[in-house]
Amino acid sequence: QSLLETLVTWTGSTFSFLPQEGTGEEPATLPSQADPDFSPREAFADDEAYSEAVYPQVQAAVASLTDRPVLPTWYPEGSLLTRVEENPMDDGYSLTLVFSWDHTEFMVSVTVYNSEAEMDIQHYEKNEGNPEPYTIHNISHYIMGNMDRNSAVWRNGPVECSLRGSLTVDQLKQMIDSIYA
């Protein structure tokens, strides 16, 4: 998708994707009907054991929701998945993965809508200035700061994703690159 295909707008403090018309294509199983089953954190001795067991479950769940590449395959060294937040919606399904890393946290969010026409307008807070477009595989990823953290947001068909946290712009780009590797 080009900048013209995914219309965006921003002000001094927010960034938003604008509504778009759908292609009419819908998956056989709608994301709103998804019901993945993730192991509870309490079942594991520590974050490392949880991360090693649950991340493959997350990958399988995302693969069942969309065939589009959305999850990074590279994370900063020492990153551990510590929490999975699920949000089944009438018009889709949302997952937020919370990682611990270097005494802080960062998040990976994936929202898969039933169709492009059902995509909500999401607002992302940002610092003054223009977001930096980072285009790979004809998909525009928008990188911006928000206070002392950085984020990247993008849409790929009926999927909206974000990376947010105490990550450098180079780390965000490396994570984005790994999605399509």
Could you describe each region identified by the protein language model?
Residues 17-42:
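Short extracytoplasmic
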Residues 34-147, 151:
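Short, solvent-exposed recognition patches
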Residues 157-181:
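Surface-exposed amphipathic alpha-helical segments
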Residues 6, 10, 61-64, 175-178:
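Residues that form generic nucleotide/phosphate-binding pockets
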Residues 1-25:
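Membrane-interface helical sensory segment of bacterial ECF anti-sigma factor regulators
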